[in-house]
Every structure is written in structure tokens, then in C-alpha cells.
Amino acid sequence: MEGSGEPQGGAPVNQDVACRVVNGERSEVREFLGREWPKADRRLFGAEVDWTSRPVVVEARAGRELAGVALGEVVAGMARLHDLLVAEGRQGQGVGGRLVELFCARAAELGAARCFLRCPDTDGHRRFYERLGFVLIAKLPRYYHGHDFLEYLREPLIQETGGTS
């Protein structure tokens, strides 16, 4: 019965543990995570880790018009650039490169030492990110909608790139 504490449709692991899918996050799950993650962090990292997500938002404007954005976050000393988008009419003018540089600078202020990102596997994306000091670390076949993506890393986060186009 729902709410009775009995597993519903669960897959037994052993005599006293069963796994099941539940709908939505429950306070009991949040409490479990709050109690168990610090222990797991100490085992793995030797200390507790601050997993607070700190958003990073950078925008480019031409007058009052939004010309581009870089969106991401810093978590546990690592930045992840989730989105970089420049208006079609503003591409090729250095806007994207400047957004990435400002994103990395802000991420460093928030304690990040490196930045990861994923992008489509195209020659243009490769040239753009490699020119900004990112290094290819993984290929992700058929990642989104059957298209290949790439995973890039920039470390150190703040560096001379030789250009920001």
C-alpha cells in the first residue's frame, strides 16, 4: 500500500532491501542525501565538499538588444559552461570569445580552477574552443538527437589565449 513503507513493485536486492521507483523527491530522500554525502565525500576526497551550485550568467548587448549569452555554474571548484549562444547577426565578431573569457573570469572568482563544456562535433566548434585554450577530452557519439558531441576542458581557467574571436 502507498505510504505504508512497504516497497511497491520493488526489485529485491537481498532479504531486507528492495529497490523501487518513486514519484518526485521526498523529504526522507533529502535527509538521506544530507546525511550520507558528507561521509562519501570524506571517503573519496578526504574532506567534505561544498556542492552548492553557483550560477554564472554573462550577457552581451548591442545597445538595448541582447546579442549573446553564456550560462553555466560553478560547483565544487569546477565550472561548467552549459550554454553559449550568440545572435545570428553577431556571430564572427568576437562576441562569443569575449563571453567565454568573462564566464571563465567570473567562474574563477567563484573558486573554479577549470571549466568543462559540451558542444556539437563540428569543425567550427573545434576551432572556436581550441583557440580559447580548451582541450578535447572526450567524444560523445550520438549524444543529442543522434548527433556527436565533444567534451572540452580548460585548465588553468585564466590564461592567455591569443585571441577571442
Regions found by a protein language model. Give the residues of each.
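Conserved N-terminal entry element of GNAT/NAT acetyltransferase domains
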Residues: 1-25, 157-165
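Acetyl-CoA-dependent GNAT
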Residues: 19-82, 87, 100-101, 106, ...
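A short, internal acetyl-CoA/4′-phosphopantetheine-binding micro-motif in the GNAT/acyltransferase core
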Residues: 84-91, 120
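Conserved acetyl-CoA-binding loop-helix of GNAT-fold acetyltransferases
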Residues: 92-105, 131
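Conserved GNAT acetyl-CoA-binding A-motif
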Residues: 107-120
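Conserved catalytic-core motifs of GNAT/GCN5-like acyltransferases
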Residues: 116-118, 135-151
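Helix-turn-helix
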Residues: 125
